[in-house]
């Protein structure tokens, strides 16, 4: 595997571990120093392909292959236009065709295949579906807001749980110190034997530990269905697909041999007399004597009637 490096100044990460590689829309890599040198005015051409680039569009290379970074950025731009969802299509087949079209566009733009026709196709689609694109953008914005709100609620719950646990630990320490101090005071002032005082102290410590270990009731945050309290759910009807139902057809296998008895008949016909009975451990793993015997008979009978042609 070739060591990563800048193709212009030939600096590699082996010689400079702090080397920061940058990539732009064309997918060619430059180090941060070369970017600052070549794009002093804020814009310039790629030294490899000559594509006009802006300095502000350079970003840190995340993947070893810069083509992957290029594809990620192209996919983001394409999905901003082709943002339809499954519920926008009357059938699953049309939705799958739409996804295949998106993948074809991303592939063409990433690998510089038929760029003019691909870009023209995107412009036509954007003009014809302007309203749908805007509606899905607003829908996506609402979903992002709901997601951020849910994350914020979860963060607050985690913070409250952390503070509650911290408070409980502090309370436990205080109670233990009080119990210890009470025991020392009794040793100083009481006339009872030390063994009796020690036994009483152990009893109180045990009761205190049991009280502290008793689980506190947790306030429910979700319903029994798994839906979080306060969460708004969509009640829109689900699109029904009018398709033919699946019909099971038994598997027909030509074994060129005698007919093998059914599983239920093996015991009556005496096939299981000399087969090891299944133990409880075998049954737990899915093994049954009749199934093993049935498989063995299939192997034994297979090909007995076969004749070379």
UniProtKB/Swiss-Prot annotation:
Primary location recorded for the protein, binned into one broad class: nucleus
SMART domains associated with the record: RING
N-acetylmethionine PTM sites in chain numbering: 1
Residue ranges of every copy of the UIM domain listed in the record: 142-161
Cellular component annotations (GO), alphabetically ordered: CAK-ERCC2 complex; cyclin-dependent protein kinase holoenzyme complex; nucleoplasm; transcription factor TFIIH core complex; transcription factor TFIIH holo complex; transcription factor TFIIK complex
Modified residues (Phosphothreonine): 51
GO molecular function, one term: zinc ion binding
Modified residues (Phosphoserine): 279
Keywords: Acetylation, Cell cycle, Metal-binding, Nucleus, Phosphoprotein, Transcription, Transcription regulation, Zinc, Zinc-finger
Tissue expression: Highest levels in colon and testis. Moderate levels are present thymus, prostate, ovary, and small intestine. The lowest levels are found in spleen and leukocytes.
Zinc finger (RING-type): 6-50
Stated role: Stabilizes the cyclin H-CDK7 complex to form a functional CDK-activating kinase (CAK) enzymatic complex. CAK activates the cyclin-associated kinases CDK1, CDK2, CDK4 and CDK6 by threonine phosphorylation. CAK complexed to the core-TFIIH basal transcription factor activates RNA polymerase II by serine phosphorylation of the repetitive C-terminal domain (CTD) of its large subunit (POLR2A), allowing its escape from the promoter and elongation of the transcripts. Involved in cell cycle control and in RNA transcription by RNA polymerase II.
Subunit (UniProt): Associates primarily with CDK7 and cyclin H to form the CAK complex. CAK can further associate with the core-TFIIH to form the TFIIH basal transcription factor.
Name by which UniProt lists this protein: CDK-activating kinase assembly factor MAT1
């Amino acid at each position: 595997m070739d060591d990563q490096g800048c193709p212009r100044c030939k600096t590699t990460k082996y010689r400079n571990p702090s080397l920061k590689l940058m990539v732009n829309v064309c997918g060619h890599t430059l180090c941060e120093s070369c970017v600052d040198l070549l794009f002093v005015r804020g814009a310039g051409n790629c030294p490899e392909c000559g594509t006009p680039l802006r300095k502000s569009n350079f970003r840190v290379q995340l993947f070893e292959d810069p083509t992957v970074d290029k594809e990620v950025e192209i996919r983001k731009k394409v999905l901003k236009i082709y943002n339809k969802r499954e519920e926008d299509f009357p059938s699953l087949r049309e939705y799958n065709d739409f996804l295949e079209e998106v993948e074809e566009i991303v592939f063409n733009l990433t690998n510089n295949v038929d760029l003019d026709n691909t870009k023209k196709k995107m412009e036509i689609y954007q003009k014809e579906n302007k309203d749908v694109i805007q509606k899905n953008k607003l829908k996506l914005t609402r979903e992002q807001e709901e997601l951020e709100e849910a994350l914020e609620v979860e963060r607050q719950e985690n913070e409250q749980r952390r503070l509650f646990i911290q408070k409980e630990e502090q309370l436990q320490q205080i109670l233990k110190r009080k119990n210890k101090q009470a025991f020392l005071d009794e040793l100083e002032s009481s006339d009872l034997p030390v063994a009796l005082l020690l036994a009483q102290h152990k009893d109180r410590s045990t009761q205190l530990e049991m009280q502290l270990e008793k689980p506190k009731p947790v306030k429910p945050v979700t319903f029994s269905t798994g839906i979080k309290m306060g969460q708004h759910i969509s009640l829109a009807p689900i699109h029904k697909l009018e398709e033919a139902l699946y019909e099971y057809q038994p598997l027909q296998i030509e074994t060129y041999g005698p007919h093998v008895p059914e599983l239920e008949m093996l015991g009556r016909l005496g096939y299981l007399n000399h087969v090891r009975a299944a133990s409880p451990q075998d049954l737990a793993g899915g093994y049954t004597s009749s199934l093993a015997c049935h498989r063995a008979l299939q192997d034994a009978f297979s090909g007995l009637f076969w004749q070379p042609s």
